[in-house]
Amino acid sequence: KPRFEDWNLIKAQALITGKVNYVDDKLRVEFRLWDVLAAKEMMALAFTTVPNNWRRVGHIISDKVYERLTGEKGYFDTRIIYVSEEGPKTQRIKKLAIMDQDGANNKFLTLGNELVLTPRFNPASQMVTYLSYFKNMPRVYLLDIETGTQEVVGDFPGMTFAPRFSPDGKKIIMSFAKDGKSDIYTMDLENRIVEKITNHPSIDT
């Protein structure tokens, strides 16, 4: 047990203790969260993982501690999907890329052969939908982050805007131009049925 009286001297409210052991080529990480004022344990967890996953375990522990102390979900074990740009002004190369929220583990997901725009995660943060132009024709793609597998959801006429997932992750919502005006459509990812959900003379995006 920690010496709570020492931590009270500096008015600490919470304290984390932990240890890391190397067992059978794996890391075992244990930690405890303590309430200093009440002098009692608030949480105790242990994780076993391969050594190169140590950063991920650190992020998971940070999320657990953050949620226990604040009541809100942590964001440490999250990733950012973005469009990377490089090259001269007249020949910009855009690639789909992903990194941890703290900037580590940056990885390119596309080669830069085509223009890519507006990447969006699904609710589980395992799939990404994005817009790309193939021979100047807009296409909506689905990409599995873990396997690298991607598929074309559909080719759409005219201008296409910002595909994204529905809150349940079962549909893609997008805007594209048809018959001279833009409306918002949904596509069911299971049966690929497209349904128009707006019908206004003005532009809907």
Stretches found by the model and what they are:
Residues 1, 100-117, 143-161, 187-203:
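Multi-bladed beta-propeller domains
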Residues 80, 128-129, 169-173:
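Hydrophobic beta-strand positions that form the internal "hydrophobic ladder"
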Residues 74-76, 123-124, 167-168:
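Residue-level detector of Asp-centered blade-edge/turn motifs that repeat once per structural unit
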Residues 2-64:
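Amphipathic beta-strand/beta-sheet edge segments enriched in Tyr/Trp
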Residues 63, 73-104:
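An edge-strand/N-cap motif at the start of beta-rich repeat modules
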